[in-house]
Amino acid sequence: MDLSVTAGPFKRSTITALAAALGLAGALLSGGAHAEGKISIAQQFGIGYLILDVVQQQKLIEKHGKEQGLDIKVDWNSISGATAMNEALLAGALDVVSAGVPPMLTIWDRTKGKQNVKAIASLGSMPNYLLSNKPDVKTLNDFTDKDRIAVPAAGVGFQSRTLQIETAKLFGNDNFKKFDNISVSLPHPDATSALIAGGSEISAHFSSPPFQYQELENPNVHKVLSSYDVLGGQATFNVLYTTQKFHDENPKTYKAFYDALAEAEKIIKADKPAAAKTYIEVEKSKLPLPLVEKIVSDPEIDFTVVPQRTFIYAEKLHELGVLKNKADRWKDFFFEEAHGGAGS
């Protein structure tokens, strides 16, 4: 089990899928059941987590906790892939996890009437691009059995579910898993290196910011599809979610966390160049600052805690039989603190 802690001012444990699955991380991190004033949070890799980077750097949870007379201890962790996130949350190893909308809906569906997992807030709307380094792959129709599409969590993650919705649209609901057999699980940084280098079995990558921008700087890489094409416009990429137990038993900690997220959104929108620097500092990114500034300022991207087009996933994934429970509206799978905005 590898539970390494990154060095430097921003410490974030890295939990492997095995540790998460076995719940061993619970012995090393703050456990799921505890009194007010503790929160353990996990995020994945990429600029989709910028709101959390700002929250961490500026200690906004601690700040909003103090406003309620509460000293909050925050544990920050990194996990790659939604499957490991969900296992860690249910094992009680983590209080709050983050992933794309579809993995959150999967665990909402699985735990309805039990742990009652729901979303806390959006981490922003941003497109995810399906990229290829093969000139002849221009549409989904051009993929063959020899191709391999890299995704963070094959079959179940945001990228795979988005691809399945588009596949159902093109090839019919019965064939929605058509591309699952050529999808392979690979963390974004590794998939990015493989696609840029070429010469490996990876001929496509359903990417996300900042990786897709990095890949598109290579002349051999081109865009095949955007998640915005699939969803009909600007849509939430990642969300934060937790159990009903944590939400109900830690009202002050939860409020401090939600208020911290809302403040981070305002901070990013007020000074995007500073937010770009925060990303590089907290994530220890080697990306050039001008590229990160370009991404943060991209009009396609909106760092907002308000959910956008999340209900499309709930509707489509229920239609495809992925979700057993039918949501009537987006508020069914978000805790009430998020209900105030003009969400969808």
Annotate each language-model stretch with its function.
Residues L317-S344:
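Conserved C-terminal helix/tail region of periplasmic/extracytoplasmic solute-binding proteins
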Residues L18-L24, L28:
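Hydrophobic helical h-region of N-terminal Sec-dependent signal peptides
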Residues K112, G172, D180-V184, P189-I280:
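Pocket-lining segment of extracytoplasmic ligand-binding domains
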Residues G37-F176, S183-S185, S203, P209, ...:
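Short, glycine-/small- and polar/acidic-enriched structural segments
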Residues S30-G32:
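N-terminal signal peptide c-region/cleavage motif recognized by signal peptidases
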Residues D248-K324:
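Secondary-structure end/capping motifs
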Residues D2-A19:
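Bacterial N-terminal signal peptides that target proteins for export
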Residues E62-L70, Y228-G232, P299-P307:
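Short, solvent-exposed loop/beta-turn-alpha elements that line the ligand-binding surface or hinge
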